[in-house]
From Swiss-Prot:
This is UDP-N-acetylmuramoylalanine--D-glutamate ligase. The lineage of its organism: Bacteria, Bacillati, Bacillota, Clostridia, Eubacteriales. Belongs to the MurCDEF family. Cell wall formation. Catalyzes the addition of glutamate to the nucleotide precursor UDP-N-acetylmuramoyl-L-alanine (UMA). It is an enzyme of class 6 (ligase). One of its GO terms (cellular component) is cytoplasm. GO terms for molecular function: ATP binding; UDP-N-acetylmuramoylalanine-D-glutamate ligase activity. Its EC number is 6.3.2.9. InterPro entries: Mur-like_cat_sf, Mur_ligase_C, Mur_ligase_C_dom_sf, Mur_ligase_cen, MurD. The gene is murD. ATP binds at residues 117-123. It comes from Symbiobacterium thermophilum (strain DSM 24528 / JCM 14929 / IAM 14863 / T). GO terms for biological process: cell division; cell wall organization; peptidoglycan biosynthetic process; regulation of cell shape.
Amino acid sequence: MAGVKLQERAAVVGIGISNMALIRYLVARGVRVTACDRTSAEKLGERAAELARLGVPLVAGEGYLEPLADHDLIFLTPGMPKHLPEIEAARRRGAAISGEIGLVLDLCRAPVIGVTGSAGKTTTTTLIGEILRAAGRETYVGGNIGKPLIEQVEAIPSEAVVVLELSSFQLQLVHRSPHIAVVTNVSPNHLDVHATMEEYVEAKKAIFRRQSPADWLVLNADDPTVRAFAAEARSRVVLFSRRADPGGRDAAFVREDRVIWRRGGRETPILFLDEIRLPGLHNQENVLAAVAACFLAGAPLSAVREVVTQFTGVEHRIEPVRVLDGVKWYNDSKATSPAEAVAALTTLPAPIVLIAGGSDKGIPFDPIAPLVAEKVKTLILMGPTAPKIEEAVRRGGYAGPIRRAADMAEAVALAREAAAPGDTVLLSPACASFDAYRNFEERGRHFKSLVEALS
């Protein structure tokens, strides 16, 4: 399908931050927008008031999808299921269906670097953006992080570069692939929205489906699912690996504790692993992915080294909070899946007091069980997934104490009680936050405020 063309009328479903920016963009260009949201107008508050000021009618609550029946251009919020009957009916009659980030990709004149994966997206995207800025490039970072780019996309010059973090939900709504596409890894995630694991993997493939032979695809050779993507690519493939030389004329890999970049068969040593400030083996993979993307985008070695040797991470990703009475506290609220919790548990030293649990994404928790059994001293569980996590870790051999917390405040209090000097307290929920918070950022900030208040 070609890129979406603006029409006289459009329906926008889901009135979140990015879609409010999209609505402002559309209204400014004379499109008559109908806003749709399952939340009541009262609960939408200021957003409903802004829609009224813009002259945009709002269909809220029950029946919010009814306007889709008479619109030929529909923009969906990324996280909603795409198989709802009203959406399927619109698709069958030929309506154009897209999202805010899909329109950004359609309109953007600058080359785009897109990053997807089940884990590591934000760190890799941020690293790429910082390296390109250090290289002197005018750089815009957005997508699943930062501010919506739709309101400024037409002002981004062709000589700039745009770096997008792209979720599987967003990729279901795009009609163009980035010039440089990066896939960090793929593991079960978002199975509360995607009908099957196969659908989730297919959504990830959209990042390269519409690439040409002039484009690049950067793949994690250590992930069998991701490496297999190479066979389906029309673009040029670059593999990265922290375990071995993955082969090929172009690759990023580790040899004798040193990051190596190979382009056209010529190898360049980049830096030693102990120069990387980011902790954990998973972050070595993120660095390799970022290094490959940035060299393909023309960044010099000096910019790569400058950033990678100084970059210490992003908020809510194994983020040190404080040391209190000999106990180290870490905020890993971004761990919204078991795979991300595994990365944190692998990185930090035992004994660990682990706070986990939240809303259910339909993912099995068995992957965390071996590390919980090996490294966790006390497990504190909260939220609807607590019983499922307890069952999984007991089945996996964890014999330590498990405490239940009604909320984050109680979880922090229980962790303080359980931890001794030399221990690590880790919030790494392995779950989404929507049972108690608007997003993982709000959850992480609440955790940090509670920890900072301890005395």
